[in-house]
């Protein structure tokens, strides 16, 4: 099933690129929480929803662009968790650092994940405890890698005082910044060793990247040391967390 989901992410990426390249208007509007949404978000959402309903008609889907109410999903044990375009701010800035995120959740755990970066044409995927990166048609297994001093990857668009204080206390390290779920993927492929997050994220922002990072050997825990959990709950918000090889 992983190959079909990867192809679905690629198809969604193609729909996004039609807007990114100017073939279709971007049509940026603000949602109720003031976050931006574009025609590309909606186009990718439609591609993924149609594809997953065909691939697995019995598994419900939770997408950022059309999340079902709590009464609908409160008893879900297995479901798809989708962000059709993660990094909309990066998309609008046209820096290429946005992704398509698709994860399969089973009893609160992301057991399959796909993160596709359309501009870079790079696909990260994970299933059955293994993670891969596909680039230029070549797919290879990836895993975390230690480095001293560690490289800490941080958000391109979301900095905060807590993060600044944490980095000051961390000891010797280097930092790099990148948008979207690519932060998880940098840790997964051994380029970075730590991704700390204090600011707000939603479950669709993290599930696919979580699957990839965990399958590559990283720990994805909240600041109390518990793994991020995707068991249905009324709020879509995650607690703060860290993705770490340590």
UniProtKB/Swiss-Prot annotation:
Keywords: Cell inner membrane, Cell membrane, Hydrolase, Magnesium, Membrane, Metal-binding. Gene3D superfamilies: 3.40.190.80, Fructose-1,6-Bisphosphatase, subunit A, domain 1. It comes from the Bacteria. Mg(2+) 2 binds at residues 83, 86, 205. InterPro entries: CysQ (IPR006240), CysQ/Inositol_MonoPase (IPR050725), Inositol_monoP_metal-BS (IPR020583), Inositol_monophosphatase-like (IPR000760), Inositol_monophosphatase_CS (IPR020550). Substrate binds at residues 64, 85-88, 205. Its cofactor is Mg(2+). The keyword Transmembrane helix does not apply. It is an enzyme of class 3 (hydrolase). It catalyses: adenosine 3',5'-bisphosphate + H2O = AMP + phosphate. One of its GO terms (biological process) is sulfate assimilation. It is a peripheral membrane protein. The keyword S-adenosyl-L-methionine does not apply. Belongs to the inositol monophosphatase superfamily. CysQ family. This is 3'(2'),5'-bisphosphate nucleotidase CysQ. The lineage of its organism: Bacteria, Pseudomonadati, Pseudomonadota, Gammaproteobacteria, Enterobacterales. The gene is cysQ.
